[in-house]
A protein has these predicted regions:
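Phosphate/oxyanion-binding active-site loops and adjacent basic polyanion-contact surfaces
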Residues: 55-66, 133-142, 166, 170
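Alpha-helix termini
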Residues: 72-82, 108, 148-152, 178-186
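Short beta-strand-to-loop acidic/aromatic patch adjacent to the donor-nucleotide binding site
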Residues: 154-165
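Active-site-proximal specificity loops/subdomain of glycosyltransferases
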Residues: 95-154
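N-proximal low-complexity "stem/linker" segments adjacent to membrane-targeting elements
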Residues: 1-71
Length: 195
C-alpha cells in the first residue's frame, strides 16, 4: 500500500480498506449526495415539555446546524471533488429575518443550496387531523422531504433536521461507510447516523 497508518487507506468509488476487515471492492459507488435539511427557525421544541440545552432562540440552533453541515460538505468536497453535493432546505414558515440569516450563510458557502417553502396546503387532504398545527407541519415537512428525495435523489439521500451539529468528517465518513457496507451486502442500504 505504501501508506502510513494515519493516512486514508481507502479510495472512494474504488476500494475500502478497514484494517480488521481487509479490502472491499466498491460496487455501490456514490457520485451524488442530496441533503434534505428541514428547518423551522421559530418553533422551539414542539413535542416536549422541556427547554433546549442552551436556551437560545431556535434560529441560533438552525444557523449552527447549517454551518456545521456546510463545513462537513466542504471537507468532503476537498477529499472527493467528483461527488456532487446538493442541499434542499425545506423551510416551515420561518420569519423573513430568519430566512435572511440562512440565505446569508448559504451565499457565503458557494455550495449548491436552495430553500423551498413547506407547502402546507398540498398535504391537508393527505394527513389526518392532528392535535395541533405543529404536529401537522412536522408530518407535512416529512412528506415533502421524502417526495423531494424521491424526485431529486440519485445515489445517496441524507435527511437531517436543523438542530443537529455535525463533525467536519461526518459526510465523508457517511459516504465511505455507505459505499463499503452496501458493496459488502450488494444492496442499497438505509443508514441512521446517530448523535
Amino acid at each position: 500500500l505504501q501508506k502510513e497508518l494515519n493516512e486514508d487507506l481507502s479510495i472512494i468509488n474504488k476500494k475500502s480498506i478497514v484494517l480488521p476487515l481487509g479490502e472491499v471492492k466498491i460496487t455501490k459507488r456514490v457520485n451524488s449526495v442530496l441533503i434534505i435539511f428541514r428547518t423551522n427557525t421559530d418553533i422551539e421544541i414542539w413535542d416536549q415539555n422541556k427547554k433546549r440545552l442552551f436556551e437560545e432562540p431556535k434560529i441560533e440552533y438552525s444557523l449552527r446546524a447549517l454551518k456545521s453541515l456546510i463545513k462537513s460538505v466542504n471537507f468532503s468536497k476537498t477529499k472527493y471533488p467528483n461527488i456532487n453535493f446538493k442541499t434542499i432546505i425545506v423551510d416551515d414558515k420561518s420569519k423573513e429575518e430568519n430566512l435572511n440569516k440562512l440565505k446569508k450563510l448559504i451565499d457565503e458557502s458557494s455550495l449548491d443550496i436552495s430553500i423551498t417553502p413547506l407547502n402546507h396546503e398540498k398535504y391537508k387532504d393527505i394527513i389526518k387531523q392532528q392535535r395541533n398545527d405543529q404536529t401537522f407541519s412536522n408530518l407535512a415537512s416529512l412528506l415533502q422531504s421524502f417526495e423531494l428525495g424521491k424526485e431529486h435523489g440519485e445515489d445517496l439521500v441524507f435527511f437531517v433536521e436543523d438542530d443537529y451539529l455535525h463533525f467536519e468528517p461526518m459526510m465523508e465518513e457517511m459516504v465511505a461507510s455507505y459505499e463499503r457496507i452496501a458493496s459488502q451486502v450488494n444492496k442499497d442500504i438505509f443508514m441512521c447516523p446517530t448523535d
